[in-house]
């Protein structure tokens, strides 16, 4: 799942290396609120889910791990890839 998230993030913002662990994507300026909205659309399509608007919070997008946890809570399919 994390590899797929990194691929989506890299397509959205190719100028950043999302493979570095432990980064706060928001605080490092790697994604902003506009990116979060675009990311939600991509994640919904990729994982066959619908992320609830109340879950579009910076803490849910602060890291690849946080995004993965959000996907699991949202019922993401095929979470092992």
Label every PLM stretch briefly.
Residues 1-18, 69-81:
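Thiotemplate assembly-line natural product biosynthesis machinery
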Residues 54-56, 61-78:
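C-terminal structural segments of small proteins and small subunits
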Residues 35:
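Two-component histidine kinase catalytic core, primarily the HATPase_c
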Residues 1, 21, 60-63:
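Short, conserved alpha-helical segments within structured domains
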């Amino acid at each position: 799942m994390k590899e797929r998230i990194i691929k989506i993030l890299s397509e959205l913002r190719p100028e950043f290396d999302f493979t570095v662990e432990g980064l706060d994507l928001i605080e490092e300026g790697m994604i902003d609120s506009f990116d979060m909205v675009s990311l939600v659309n991509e994640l919904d399509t990729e994982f066959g889910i619908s992320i609830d608007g109340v879950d579009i919070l910076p803490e849910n997008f602060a890291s690849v791990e946080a995004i993965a946890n959000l996907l699991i809570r949202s019922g993401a399919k095929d979470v092992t890839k």
